[in-house]
Amino acid sequence: MSKPIQMEKGVKYRDADKMALIPVKNMPTEQKEVLRKPEWMKIKLPASSKRIDDIKSAMRKNNLHSVCEEASCPNLAECFNHGTATFMILGAICTRRCPFCDVAHGRPVAPEAEEPKKLAKTIQDMKLKYVVITSVDRDDLRDGGAQHFADCNREIRALNPEIRIETLVPDFRGRMDRALEAMIDNPPDVFNHNLETAPRLYRKVRPGANYQWSLDLLKKFKEQHPNVPTKSGLMMGLGETKEEIVEVLKDLRAHGVTMLTLGQYLAPSRHHLPVERYVPPAEFDELKEIALELGFTHAACGPFVRSSYHADLQAKGEEVK
C-alpha cells in the first residue's frame, strides 16, 4: 500500500499528484481514449497583445492571481483583450481537489491582509468598469474566506465608486451562516455560485460538495439581498442528460436564481475527468430557450461560455454565447 502524499504548506499540487489525492476512486486518472474535438470546438486563439501583457504585468506586480490563468481558461486571450479579468483572491491553492478543475490543490498559506487594497488599486489602474472576484475554496478558514470577499468589495468601491462587482463564491461548506453574515454590509452587485453539474454526478465531479447546500446558499443570500441578482453555472459533457439539466434549471429558479451560464466542459489534462460528450451548439440554443421560458432573465449558453465569460455583457442582458 502506497503512502499518502505529505502536502507541504504553500506548495501547488497539480495533475497526477492532485488527482492521486481524490478520495473517491470511481474514475481513471488517465483516460485511454480522448474524444476528438468537433469542428465547432476548433477555434484559433488570438495571439498575445499589449493588452494581455499589461494585465498580466499588473497582476504580477501586486502578486494577484486570475482564475483565467490558474484554471487554464480557453477564453483568456479574448477576455484580456476585451479588458476584463476574473481576479482570484485568497491565494492560488485550493483546499478541495475537484477532478474537473485545473486550479492547484494543497495547504494554502494565510490570506494576505493587504490583498483587498492591492486589488482595488490594480482595478483602478486598469480602469475597469465591471469586475469579477472569485476564490479558491478555503476550508481552513473559519468563515471560508467570506470576510475577505467583503473587504475586497469595500476597498474596490472606495477607489472605484462607479464599478460593478460580481462575486463568484465557493460553497462555504459548514460555514454558510457565518459567511453570509460577514458579507451582509458589503454585498456584490451580482452574487454567483456554480452548481457545476447534475446532482447524480456530484460524487464524481464535486467530491466534498452538496447539491442542496449550494442551492440553499443561493436562496439565503437572495433572501438577505432581494435586489441583488443571483447567478449560477453548469458544465455540459460530463455524462449528464438533458432531462437532468432541465431539472437543475427548475431547482435554480425555485431558489430565486435569475442568471444562468451553460458551457462545454473541457478536460484540462489527461489526468482530469474525461469529456463524455461534446454538446452541439443547437442543443445549447434549445436549453437557452427552456431557461428563458422558466423565467431566467438572462441565460448565456454555448460551447465556450464560462461563468465569468463577458460577465459585464451578461449583467447588461446582452447576447453571449
From Swiss-Prot:
Entry binding sites for [4Fe-4S] cluster 2: 94, 98, 101
Cofactor note: Binds 2 [4Fe-4S] clusters per subunit. One cluster is coordinated with 3 cysteines and an exchangeable S-adenosyl-L-methionine.
Pathway where this protein functions: Protein modification; protein lipoylation via endogenous pathway; protein N(6)-(lipoyl)lysine from octanoyl-[acyl-carrier-protein]: step 2/2
Domain Radical SAM core: 80-297
Entry-linked Gene3D superfamilies: Aldolase class I (3.20.20.70)
Entry superkingdom: Bacteria
Keyword terms of this UniProt record: 4Fe-4S, Cytoplasm, Iron, Iron-sulfur, Metal-binding, S-adenosyl-L-methionine, Transferase
SUPFAM superfamilies linked to this entry: Radical SAM enzymes (SSF102114)
Localization terms from the record: Cytoplasm
One of the record's GO molecular function terms: lipoate synthase activity
Principal subcellular localisation of the protein: cytoplasm
Gene Ontology CC: cytoplasm
Pfam families, per the entry: LIAS_N, Radical_SAM
HAMAP family: Lipoyl_synth
Family: Belongs to the radical SAM superfamily. Lipoyl synthase family.
Protein's UniProt name: Lipoyl synthase
Gene name of this polypeptide: lipA
